[in-house]
Amino acid sequence: MSMQDPISDMLTRVRNGQAANKVAVKMPSSKLKVAIAALLKAEGYIVDFAVDSEAKPELEVTLKYFQAKPVIEQIKRVSRPGLRVYKNKDSLPTVMGGLGIAVVSTSKGLMSDRAARKAGLGGEIICYVA
């Protein structure tokens, strides 16, 4: 069975891993998943990530907890294969009044909504993280 939406699968694995208090979760790797993991690490939502470059590359994301509670309270896919969501620089959303981030795919690469607003770029809204 082929996977229709690998990004949704990644977000679901992270969500389920934190619900089960796992230390880390593994998933098939891709350039976009690695870029999302790098952004989550830079924003402080995960501890670390690593790519095992074997026959089938695998991405391992080390999850982050604070006082035994998951740091990621909510992670939600926005733009999906059946309904792509694009926003220009003026209509980029703020997540939880600025406490969360929106992952935006721009012409300059993947970045948070704050960084995209600062750079004056719009793009595809991949997901919300809070």
Curated annotation (Swiss-Prot):
SS bonds (residue pairs): none
GO annotation (BP), single: translation
Keywords from the UniProt entry: Ribonucleoprotein, Ribosomal protein, RNA-binding, rRNA-binding
Pfam families xrefs: Ribosomal_S8
The UniProt record lists the keyword NAD: no
Entry keyword Acyltransferase: no
Annotated GO MF terms: rRNA binding; structural constituent of ribosome
GO cellular component: ribonucleoprotein complex; ribosome
Function: One of the primary rRNA binding proteins, it binds directly to 16S rRNA central domain where it helps coordinate assembly of the platform of the 30S subunit.
Family: Belongs to the universal ribosomal protein uS8 family.
Quaternary structure and partners: Part of the 30S ribosomal subunit. Contacts proteins S5 and S12.
Protein name: Small ribosomal subunit protein uS8
Species of provenance: Vibrio atlanticus (strain LGP32)
Encoding gene (name): rpsH
